[in-house]
């Protein structure tokens, strides 16, 4: 018999220890991975609810199982809030991840072998935008576009490629691009070749919800996003559209039964909570601080002589180009990690090193801002990072930096 007081600590000491260690790591490390964030206790409460027990294949009001009347309410809330938050007619909240949301779009709109125009992974795109190692690169004819010497998306190149190759779909969006994207220009290019415009806004969804970054929703046929990252919800995916009933039916069928079976109702409940939180004034203020903190860090890195890809940032992330410093991204990642500062190694444009080594690091501010970092704190943090990078391998500098990190983490806990 199941009892309410059952717990992991008394039953599975090994797993409980791992959970406790990760909890401590999150509290004592500064998180700068651009795709990571801290979700709220309310979201975690929803994810730990009894909704996890319910199988609900299908959609609200059209389920294949009985007993779905209450999970229907939860999913309807999530759908309505997503539509309200992003200004659209249609939302599918069932994708288990951003990659599965993207996969559903491919399935709904393309046939294997169709031509797709997507941002090169080496220039800031995502695996699912046509990387050869991903399903998108294996099953479709992908033509990559990139950024120019100034670090801006080269729309003229994109148009030339579109006119030459006549893609059926053009993909906008990125995983490592720090500038404003001209969604309107992308749609104009797509219209010239009668292509779908599909935008993956996963990295900037929170900024878009808060009005801190231009929305692609009025321009794209389909938009996808993750629900974590800047949106700060549970890990999951979301599909949005204003393109009409025929499109909505294709997308729904591609998610279920096309790519998934039963949805994760506890995660959908978490999404509903997160969308409600994203409509609060505090969330909008938070997103504004995310951008300010990123700009403050960029300014400090540049003052210390570090090259920033695209020469700045207009969102939550930026890339530090370490080629001139003769430091690998892998070594920078390890040195900063030893000082309790978590980043990820990242390729930079025209990177001479492999993706497993790289010549850069990607830095993002959603998580530090979530725990209360101000612009002054962000500037100070950038200085600490430069100290470590200027002295790669110097254990004394790493240890001194680690102590500073522990102090600020104690002052600004993730969960107070």
UniProtKB/Swiss-Prot annotation:
SUPFAM superfamilies: PLP-dependent transferases
Modified residues (N6-(pyridoxal phosphate)lysine): 229
Coiled coil feature spans: none
This protein's record includes keyword Cytoplasm: yes
Entry-linked InterPro entries: PyrdxlP-dep_Trfase (IPR015424), PyrdxlP-dep_Trfase_major (IPR015421), PyrdxlP-dep_Trfase_small (IPR015422), Ser_HO-MeTrfase (IPR001085), Ser_HO-MeTrfase-like (IPR049943), Ser_HO-MeTrfase_PLP_BS (IPR019798), SHMT-like_dom (IPR039429)
GO cellular component assignments: cytosol
GO MF annotations in UniProt: glycine hydroxymethyltransferase activity; pyridoxal phosphate binding
PANTHER family per UniProt: SERINE HYDROXYMETHYLTRANSFERASE
HAMAP family: SHMT
Protein's recorded name: Serine hydroxymethyltransferase 1
């Amino acid at each position: 018999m199941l009892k309410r007081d059952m717990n992991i600590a008394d039953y599975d000491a090994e797993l409980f220890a791992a959970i406790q260690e990760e909890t401590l790591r999150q509290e004592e490390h500064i998180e700068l991975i651009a795709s990571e964030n801290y979700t709220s206790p309310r979201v975690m409460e929803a994810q730990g609810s009894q909704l996890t027990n319910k199988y609900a294949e299908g959609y609200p009001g059209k389920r294949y199982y009985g007993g779905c009347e209450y999970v229907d309410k939860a999913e309807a809330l999530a759908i309505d809030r997503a539509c309200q938050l992003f200004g659209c007619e249609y939302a599918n909240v069932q994708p288990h991840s951003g990659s599965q949301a993207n996969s559903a779009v491919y399935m709904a709109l393309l046939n294997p072998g169709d031509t797709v125009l997507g941002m090169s992974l080496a220039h800031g795109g995502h695996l699912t935008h046509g990387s050869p190692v991903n399903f998108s690169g294996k099953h479709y004819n992908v033509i990559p576009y990139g950024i120019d010497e100034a670090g801006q998306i080269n729309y003229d190149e994109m148009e030339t490629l579109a006119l030459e190759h006549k893609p059926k779909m053009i993909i906008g969006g990125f995983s490592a691009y720090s500038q404003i994207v001209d969604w309107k220009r992308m749609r104009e290019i797509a219209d010239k070749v009668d292509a779908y415009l599909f935008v993956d806004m996963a990295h900037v969804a929170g900024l878009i919800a808060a009005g801190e970054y231009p929305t692609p929703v009025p321009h794209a046929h389909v938009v996808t996003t993750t629900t974590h990252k800047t949106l700060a919800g549970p890990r999951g995916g979301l599909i949005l559209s204003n393109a009409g009933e025929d499109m909505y039916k294709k997308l729904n069928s591609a998610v279920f039964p096309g790519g998934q079976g039963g949805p994760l109702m506890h995660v959908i409940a978490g999404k509903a909570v997160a969308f409600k939180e994203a409509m609060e004034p505090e969330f909008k203020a938070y997103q504004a601080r995310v951008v300010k903190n990123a700009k403050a860090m960029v300014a400090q890195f540049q003052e210390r002589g570090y090259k920033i890809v695209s020469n700045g940032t207009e969102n939550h992330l930026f890339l530090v180009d370490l080629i001139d410093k003769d430091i690998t991204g892998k070594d920078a990642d390890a040195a900063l990690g030893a000082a309790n500062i978590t980043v990820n190694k990242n390729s930079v444009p025209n990177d001479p090193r492999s993706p497993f080594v790289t010549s850069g690091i990607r830095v993002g501010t959603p998580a530090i801002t979530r725990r209360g970092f101000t612009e002054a704190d962000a500037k100070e943090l950038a200085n600490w990072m430069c100290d470590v990078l200027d002295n790669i391998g110097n254990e004394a500098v790493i240890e001194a930096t680690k102590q500073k990190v522990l102090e600020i983490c104690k002052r600004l806990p993730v969960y107070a």
